[in-house]
Amino acid sequence: MLLAKGGGIVDIPSNHSVDQTVEKLRAILEANGVSLFALVDHSGEAEKVGMKMRPTKLLIFGSPSAGTPLMLAAPSLALDLPLKVLIREDDNGRVWVSYNSPDYLKERHGLP
């Protein structure tokens, strides 16, 4: 089920842990020739400064062959590329996969 929130965010529930979901997405990206540029462990970084945060990780990924033509058409799109997917656990222990809606990005950057 896709849940669109205000601001163009799409939330999809995951039946797996944050780490399992990250690994599944990494495998999908790799199988499709998409580069994973970074994996940000927000909860791990919070722990380093003595703060507690539920498991929260951000994947930053993309494909120059797909993204470059879009940025040539709408240079402001570089603000939102490479793409990002947030995987987090909520206060109830439910894991969510969140990303910016493609329709939101199209509208935001004036793409046809």
What is each stretch, according to the model?
Residues 100-105:
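Short, solvent-exposed aromatic-acidic interface loops
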Residues 107-112:
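Well-ordered alpha/beta subsegment
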Residues 1-2, 96-98:
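Short, compositionally biased low-complexity segments
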